[in-house]
Amino acid sequence: MKRKLFTAVCILLASAIAPYGAFAKAKKDAKKDIGIQLYSVRDLIGSFGRNQHDYKPVLKALADMGYTSIEAASYNDGKFYGNTPEEFRRDVEAVGMKVLSSHCGKGLSDEELASGDFSESMKWWDQCIAAHKAAGMEYIVTPYLPVPKTLKEMQTYCDYLNAIGKKCREAGIKYGYHNHAHE
């Protein structure tokens, strides 16, 4: 009787403990998706057409640290960090990371704010969205806009951001606005 009880207790303990070891191994082997905003390392790679550096070693170092995706922060004149969208995507993917998103934006001119007609700025966005699509971006985030001085300017900016969002959606890209404390 004691032998049967001992055997039963051992089997119960083993079956209770076994899954923990399997879960621990699976958890250890799982790779997490962690992205980095390249604005965080702008001093190393340059940004917005200034102080351009070879960003490939920085991308490699970030991938080696375990990052799996990036958010660009240097879209300028149809390029990312001085490279075509296709070149930029290739360079990021070459180190095993994914191009996920980008921070970029274009404020409205005084004339556009006064008239409420932002069709000229939307031409810029047409090129911008096409470049982001070519780079493989899933998201575009506008990180900053000037603080509107009047309620009318605020409404114009709301209409503007909604128009950008609509164009992005039509291109299969998600769009957002990254607010700050001053807004």
Features from the language model and the residues they span:
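Surface-exposed cleft-lining segments at the edges of enzyme active sites
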Residues: 114-116, 144-153, 179-183
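Active-site cleft segment of glycoside hydrolase catalytic domains centered on the general acid/base Glu
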Residues: 147-168
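Acidic/histidine-rich catalytic cores of soluble enzymes
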Residues: 69-70, 166-183
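Bacterial Sec-dependent N-terminal signal peptides
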Residues: 1-28
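N-terminal pre-domain/capping segments
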Residues: 2, 23-138, 173
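Hydrophobic, well-ordered secondary-structure segments
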Residues: 55, 154-157, 175
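A short small-residue
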Residues: 136-146
